[in-house]
């Protein structure tokens, strides 16, 4: 039996748009938040590129439809129409994403299974599936962008497997401490965040919130935390 063609759909807004929708450090202005999202997107790209799979980045200028669900369905179907019959979907939200997560998703989809990487907020950070497991009518009814999504999407997909335990989800209330603690994996981003916060301290002569935490104060001297 011939193996189906597999592609990655990177469904993510441009950094300039994302910085307006979900600023992670709103008090530091638009440009800082744009740069944060550029680094996050660069990191996701570095994870996708070694797979050798075709990657289709559908940003906000290319998305068509009313509402998140319809836009995502249209994007997925546009890739199926190119002749691909297996698809992995991810976006910017999984800042804890590692190569092992994507590799496991590839393995599951190639084995004929659908798969999900859950978020701690009840969402889905990565979706893997065959074209035959996709149902537009069902997907349009799913509670996208809510804490109910994962459970309903899991029930919607046949032969669905979990890629890993739930990971933190990037949102406007993200704890910057978490990004700093992950500095072993987000070295450039962590260094930039530290520089921004330290500049604020120097200009305002007041400690940024993270300095109140002794753990955060010592982050630059620590190695990366162990994560299974």
Question: Whereabouts are the PLM-identified features?
Answer:
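A short, conserved beta-to-alpha structural element at the edge of catalytic cores
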Residues: 112-133, 198-203
């Amino acid at each position: 039996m011939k193996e189906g063609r597999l592609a990655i759909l990177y469904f993510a807004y441009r950094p300039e748009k994302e910085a307006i929708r979900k600023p992670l450090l709103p008090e530091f202005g638009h440009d800082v938040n744009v740069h944060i999202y550029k680094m996050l997107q660069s990191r996701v790209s570095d994870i996708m590129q070694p797979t050798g799979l075709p990657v289709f980045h559908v940003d906000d200028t290319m998305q068509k439809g009313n509402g998140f669900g319809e836009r995502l369905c249209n994007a997925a179907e546009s890739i199926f129409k190119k002749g691909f019959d297996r698809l992995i979907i991810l976006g910017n939200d999984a800042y804890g994403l590692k190569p092992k997560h994507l590799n496991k998703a590839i393995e599951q989809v190639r084995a004929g299974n659908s798969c999900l990487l859950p978020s701690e907020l009840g969402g889905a950070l990565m979706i893997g599936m065959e074209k035959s497991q996709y149902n537009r009518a069902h997907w349009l009814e799913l509670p996208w962008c809510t804490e109910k999504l994962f459970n309903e999407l899991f029930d919607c997909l046949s032969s669905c497997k979990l890629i890993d335990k739930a990971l933190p989800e990037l949102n406007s209330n993200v704890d910057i401490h978490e990004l700093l603690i992950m500095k072993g994996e987000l070295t450039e981003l962590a260094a930039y965040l530290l520089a921004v916060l330290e500049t604020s301290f120097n200009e305002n002569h007041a400690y940024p919130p993270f300095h109140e935490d002794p753990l955060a104060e010592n982050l630059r001297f620590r190695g990366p935390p162990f994560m299974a």
